[in-house]
Amino acid sequence: MAKRPTKRAVVLLSGGLDSTTCLAVARRDGFEAHCLSVDYGQRHKGELARARRLSRALGAADHRVVKVDLSAFGGSALTDRAIAVPKGRSGRRRAAEIPVTYVPARNTVLLALALAHAETLGAEDVYVGVNAIDYSGYPDCRPAFLRAFERLATVATKAGVEGRPLRIHAPLLRLTKAGIVRLGTSLGVPYRVTLSCYDPVRGRACGACDACVLRRKGFAEAGIPDPTLYVQK
């Protein structure tokens, strides 16, 4: 009997809670996962080392880090140390405004890199861990953005023109953070290794930035112990 061809997918992996859960979902879905992390000049580079560990732990086929320096443009607290990372924002503020931690065009750039990697691999699937429920209000984490990028990929690539359009999977898009934590826990995600914090202190999560607040909320609402060591209790 002929061997069935391997299903390959590129998984954007930051080393945080969402993207790591997304990797576990891709593996559950039967894909050979090719993880792509991007060093875009972020101040929280510690996540890249976590991503490598997590890719191995969850059985990825490989893990690649690509450098694209978005800090050259500035404009975000995540790439410019002169801009303070907001701490202690309320849920109402998160819903009402786009914070200074938004990195201009970041997800457009990351998905473009994933698209290029997928096309060279002969993969037709990309997984991304964006979320539009418990999130910081970024415009490039919304369903309309993902649909638009998928259409772009169809007309912008050799594969798409030849009738093999790219599929973008965003399995966490409409889950609460608690739902994401429950899903990842059921799939064996080692959350103690993940790092979500925007402003870590000597490798430890600050406990007060948007990412930490949402992470803590997710574990609390899921009723699952949070293994994270926070600087601010």
UniProtKB/Swiss-Prot annotation:
Cofactor(s) required, per the database record: Zn(2+)
InterPro entries the record matches: QueC, Rossmann-like_a/b/a_fold
Binding site for Zn(2+): 197, 206, 209, 212
Record carries keyword Metal-binding: yes
Pathway(s) the chain acts in: Purine metabolism; 7-cyano-7-deazaguanine biosynthesis
GO biological process, one term: queuosine biosynthetic process
Co-factor note (free text): Binds 1 zinc ion per subunit.
Alphabetized SUPFAM superfamilies for the sequence: Adenine nucleotide alpha hydrolases-like
Entries under Gene3D superfamilies matching the protein: HUPs
Catalytic activity annotation: 7-carboxy-7-deazaguanine + NH4(+) + ATP = 7-cyano-7-deazaguanine + ADP + phosphate + H2O + H(+)
Record carries keyword Metal-binding: yes
Keyword vocabulary terms for this entry: ATP-binding, Ligase, Metal-binding, Nucleotide-binding, Queuosine biosynthesis, Zinc
Residues annotated for ATP binding in this entry: 13-23
EC assignment: 6.3.4.20
Taxonomic superkingdom: Bacteria
Example GO molecular function: zinc ion binding
Top-level EC class as recorded in UniProt: ligase
Described function: Catalyzes the ATP-dependent conversion of 7-carboxy-7-deazaguanine (CDG) to 7-cyano-7-deazaguanine (preQ(0)).
Family statement: Belongs to the QueC family.
UniProt-recorded name of the protein: 7-cyano-7-deazaguanine synthase
